[in-house]
Amino acid sequence: MGHRKLSSPRRGSAGLRPRKRSEELLPSPRSYPEVNLPNPVTLGFVGYKVGMTHIFMIDEDRSSSMFGKEIYVPVTVLETPPIYVLALRAYGLNNRGEHSVMGEVWGDLGDFGKFITRRIRGLKIDKEKKEHQLKDIESNLESVSYFRLLVSTQPHLIPALGKKTPDIVEVQIGGGNTKNQLEYGLKLLGNTLSVRDVFKEGQLMDIIGVTKGHGFQGVIKRYGVQELPRWHKHRKGSRKVGTKGPSLGTPSYVPQPGQMGFHRRTEYNKRILKISDDTKLINPKGGFVRYGLVKNTYLLVQGSTIGSIKRPLFLRYPIRPYSAQLPVPKVTYVDVNSKQG
């Protein structure tokens, strides 16, 4: 027989195509959850990945044999300085039935304008035009589907990043009605927003970001294909597939070498174990490897997360949570031993 068997399992997931480099370092969500809250709330935030450590906490799972006892949990540290609210955008349906921007209102940038001009060149805010745009939004409030905030990070507050150019992204407003969302967004214009205003300890969230890049890789590393034996009859190589199929076009499910990593991915239902401003509680001796010391508010997220160190990650309200409400974790110990090895 010329084949090993009648069929073989496909390699890779078609849901992750195309396996190409992400177009942006900080991707914005394609969708947001519907939040049934009486008051408006911002449905996302931005944090920077610091590194990993471990903690001890009380097990809250009643079905676990360790219920009520201390357990070892690996955590990821995300540094989350306040984000600056630049503008408020109103979205509505256009003639083609698609959501588009109906209007936007910019806030006063003040001293923060010198950082924004690094990202948006030639930005000028006309106060008269601002009042006119606000009146247009208020008059067409019934046609507004949702509001989004245009926010900017403040990397100059994080010495470890070594950059001042901010990352700009949109964050949707949820909860309340359209009028309440408009009032909520106008109050935030020109002000900063803390991570405590968005998330709470014990809450679930989704992390959207770009994975660590590995460049151009072969089928062995990219798809986990078994390496062929290295004997005299396999003279055309071992780190490759045995056959790519018929000559008239290769099937799409056949493993091929190409780009590996630096893909846009979403991790669902990551739990926040702790939100704190006490940097002495988390900074290890000698600082985090290839990062340094944490200087701002930070999150401890259960388990590992996507992305490399210093990479911005978008933190979104969970779009499909497995639990409506979880208790606040009881953290008893945080490891601050040196990570230098």
From Swiss-Prot:
Sample GO molecular function, one term: structural constituent of ribosome
Gene3D superfamilies in UniProt: 3.30.1430.10, Ribosomal protein L3, domain 3, Translation factors
Subunit structure of this chain's protein: Part of the 50S ribosomal subunit. Forms a cluster with proteins L14 and L24e.
Biological classification of the source: Archaea, Thermoproteota, Thermoprotei, Sulfolobales, Sulfolobaceae
Pfam families hit by this protein: Ribosomal_L3
Known function: One of the primary rRNA binding proteins, it binds directly near the 3'-end of the 23S rRNA, where it nucleates assembly of the 50S subunit.
Name of the protein this chain belongs to: Large ribosomal subunit protein uL3
Keywords recorded for this protein, A-Z: Ribonucleoprotein, Ribosomal protein, RNA-binding, rRNA-binding
InterPro entries cross-referenced by the UniProt entry: L3_arc_euk, Ribosomal_L3_dom_3_arc_sf, Ribosomal_uL3, Ribosomal_uL3_arc, Ribosomal_uL3_CS, Transl_B-barrel_sf
Covalent S-S links between cysteines: none
GO cellular component: cytosolic large ribosomal subunit
Region spans: Disordered: 1-31, 234-261
Tagged with keyword Transcription: no
GO biological process, one term: translation
NCBIfam families recorded: L3_arch (TIGR03626), PRK04231.1 (NF003261)
Family: Belongs to the universal ribosomal protein uL3 family.
